C-alpha cells in the first residue's frame, strides 16, 4: 500500500471550463490596452491630435470656399491631417464606445468559454507538489466552490505536457463533495496551489511554476542573503538549483532568458568539473563532413558551428581527397608542456639551477620524481630560459589520452618541491610563467611544439581539381604562395600561414568536448602546395605543431561530446595503447584541416567565395524585427 502511494510520477489534473467556473475573469478589453503609454498620456495625445486636425481642416475648408477652390483638391498636409483625424476618431470611439461595440458584435466572454468548441482548447494544468492518494469514498476537503479561485492563479493559456492527464469534470467534483465514489486513480487536488510566475505572456514562451519553498529561496537569492553558488550544495538537486538561479537572475536583471533552454540537460554531469552556477545551456548545430579517407580509414567528422558554408566546404574537400586516394597523416611529437617561473637572489644562482636541470645525469632522478604524479605522465624533457635572475623551466611530458594540463602541473609541482632541498633560496613565483605557452600565440609553440605535432599530406589528381574543385593546379599553387606564405609574412603572422585552419579546429573542438580556447595554438598551421607529376596533379600538405586534444576528462565526458567522439571511434581511453585515441583524434583534426584548406583555396582561386557565402551564410531574417 505504501509503495503504491509513493508514485514517482506526479500526475496532473485538467479542469474543464464551464459556465459556472470560468477560467478567466470577464474583463472587457479597451482600445488603450494595445498602447504602451499610460492611459492619461494616451488620452491627452489623441484628444489634442483630434481637435488640432479638426481646426486645421475647418480653416482650410473656409479658405477654399473663399478662394473658389474645389474641396476635393487636397494638398499633402491636408492628406496627413485627414489620416490623423481618422486615426484619432477611431481611437476615441474605441475607447469610449468599446462596451457598446462589443455588445453588438462579440458574444459575452462567459458564453465564449461555455461553448463546446472551446472546452478542449483552454485546458489548465494544476501540478501537484505534495499530494497524497486518498481511497475512493473518503471525505475530501476539495469542495467545488474552491475551484474557480485556484484556476485564476494559473494563466488561462494552453499548456502542453508529455504525460497523459485525466480530465476532472464538474460531475466528478460534485461526487467528491457529496462523498460518492469517484475514480481516484490519480492524486487528489493539492492542498495549496503552486505559485505561477509569468512575465508578459504574449512575449514570453515559458511560464515558470514554482512552489512556495522555491519562491522563498528565489527571494533570498535576489536579496543577497543566500549565495547563488551554494544552491547545489544546499538543495542537493542540480537541475532545481539551476532553475532557481535562472529565475533569480531574470528578476535581478529584468531580462528574459526564455530563449535559453533549461530542460534536457544533465546538470549533475557538470557539477564541480565543467561549469559553475549554470542557468541553462547553449545549443550549437552539429554538421558532418566526410567521409574523410585518412590513412586508409574513413571518418565522418562532426563539426559544431554557426557559420554557413563551413561544413559544406570541408565536405567538398573530403570528397576531393577521397576521389584522389585519400590522405596520409604522421604524428611527429606528443608532449604537453608546463613552464613555472622561479626567482633567485642573483642571476648566477639561476644559471646554476639551469645547468643542473639540463645535465643528462640528473634527468633520470627528476623523471622519477615527476612520474610519481600519474601512471600516464612521463617526463620527456626540460628546457630552461633565463631572464636576469628569473628562470623559466619548460617541462614536457606524455599524458596518455588526456589533454594533460592538470597531469603535467602535478608533476611539475613534485619536481619543484624536490628542488627546494638543494636550492632552498629558490622562490617559486608561479606554476605557470607563460613559457609553456597556453592559450596564447607564441613562437615557442610554433618552433618546439605543444601537445601533438602532426603533418598531413595528399596528392589531388588534376581531373579532381578541375571537376570537383572547379579550378586548376596552377591557380592553387600561385594563390597559396601569394596568400598563405607571402601575405602572412607581410602581416607578420605567427603560425598563421594558412587560409582558415582555426575554423575547422574550433568546430571539431566544440563538437568533441575540447577546450575551445586552445584553438589559439592548436590552429598554428602552414599550408604548402606544389604541382607534381609534370604539373598535372597537386601536392598539398598542412603542418600543425601544437594540436592540444584529449579523449578523457573535461568536456569529453558530456553526453553530446561523448557521442561525437564515439562517431570518430576515439571515445574514452584506449584499451590497447595509452594515448592512442588522443593521437588519432589529432590526426583526424589535421586531415579535416587539410580538406578545409583545399576547398577554401579552390573557392578563392575560382572566385566563388562571395557567391557561396551570399547563398549559404547570409541570414534571411530581419534582425531589426528580432531585436524588437
From Swiss-Prot:
Functional pathway: Metabolic intermediate biosynthesis; (R)-mevalonate biosynthesis; (R)-mevalonate from acetyl-CoA: step 3/3
Function: Catalyzes the synthesis of mevalonate. The specific precursor of all isoprenoid compounds present in plants.
Positions annotated with a glycan in the UniProt record: 153, 371, 484, 617, 625
Organism: Gossypium hirsutum (Upland cotton)
Gene3D superfamilies found in the cross-reference section: 3-hydroxy-3-methylglutaryl-coenzyme A Reductase, Chain A, domain 2 (3.90.770.10), HMGR, N-terminal domain (1.10.3270.10), Hydroxymethylglutaryl-CoA reductase, class I/II, NAD/NADP-binding domain (3.30.70.420)
Pfam families in alphabetical order: HMG-CoA_red (PF00368)
EC number: 1.1.1.34
GO cellular component, one term: endoplasmic reticulum membrane
Signal peptide: none
One GO-annotated biological process of the protein: sterol biosynthetic process
Family stated for the protein in its record: Belongs to the HMG-CoA reductase family.
Compartment annotation: Endoplasmic reticulum membrane; Mitochondrion membrane; Plastid membrane
NCBIfam families reported for this sequence: HMG_CoA_R_NADP
PANTHER family assigned to the protein according to its UniProt record, in alphabetical order: 3-HYDROXY-3-METHYLGLUTARYL-COENZYME A REDUCTASE (PTHR10572), 3-HYDROXY-3-METHYLGLUTARYL-COENZYME A REDUCTASE 1 (PTHR10572:SF44)
Protein name: 3-hydroxy-3-methylglutaryl-coenzyme A reductase 2
CDD domains: HMG-CoA_reductase_classI
Record bears the keyword NADP: yes
Name of the gene: HMG2
UniProt xrefs under PROSITE patterns: HMG_COA_REDUCTASE_1, HMG_COA_REDUCTASE_2, HMG_COA_REDUCTASE_3, HMG_COA_REDUCTASE_4
Region (Catalytic): 213-628
Substrates-to-products reaction catalysed: (R)-mevalonate + 2 NADP(+) + CoA = (3S)-3-hydroxy-3-methylglutaryl-CoA + 2 NADPH + 2 H(+)
Active site location: 307, 439, 515, 613
Membrane topology: Multi-pass membrane protein
Transmembrane regions listed in the UniProt entry: 38-58, 78-98
Region (Linker): 99-212
InterPro entries according to UniProt: HMG_CoA_Rdtase, HMG_CoA_Rdtase_cat_sf, HMG_CoA_Rdtase_CS, HMG_CoA_Rdtase_eu_arc, HMG_CoA_Rdtase_N, HMG_CoA_Rdtase_NAD(P)-bd_sf, HMG_CoA_Rdtase_sub-bd_dom_sf
